[in-house]
Amino acid sequence: YNGDWVADSREGKGTFQYVNGDKYVGDWKADVQHGKGIYYFSSGDRYEGDYVEGERTGQGIYVHKNGDKYVGEFKSGEQSGQGTFTWSNGAVYEGQWIDNVRSGKGRYKWANGDEYEGDWKNDMPDGEGVLTMADGTRYKGGFSKGMEEGKGVMLTPEGIRFEGSFKQGKK
């Protein structure tokens, strides 16, 4: 550890190099990470943001070695609250998270241009939502486990409209 000490505790600004190669640079309070800091993982990942009593809690940015990036709220070290995740392939999710899982309201845009906006549960569209395909096909209605389910309306680019029940993504 290189930094400020108060009564044999890390307190203030400092840098700690872990045995596994990880490194933390930032604020300390009562010998734990507390305040603003940057954590460099030996894997190549990086977190920059708020810490509360040694845990990523508050606003932060987590950048993965592969280029994936999350910007938003953290709670107890997990992506929880409002946030945006951008995958290295160009896909983007903006919305609510619970423990690193898309849950609540959100919008996901695939790299191919397809887009879903609505309810999420267990990392999948689940509840009410709108799916707009890159070819212009649009579905508005129920979803379950990532597929069209229940009552809904589908409109094709040619103007064909189907209103009725869907089961596992089929009319």
Region annotations inferred by a language model:
Residues 34, 61-64, 88, 133, ...:
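Short intrinsically disordered, low-complexity segments
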Residues 1-11, 23-34, 46-57, 69-80, ...:
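Conserved anchor residues at repeat-unit boundaries in beta-strand-based tandem repeats, strongest
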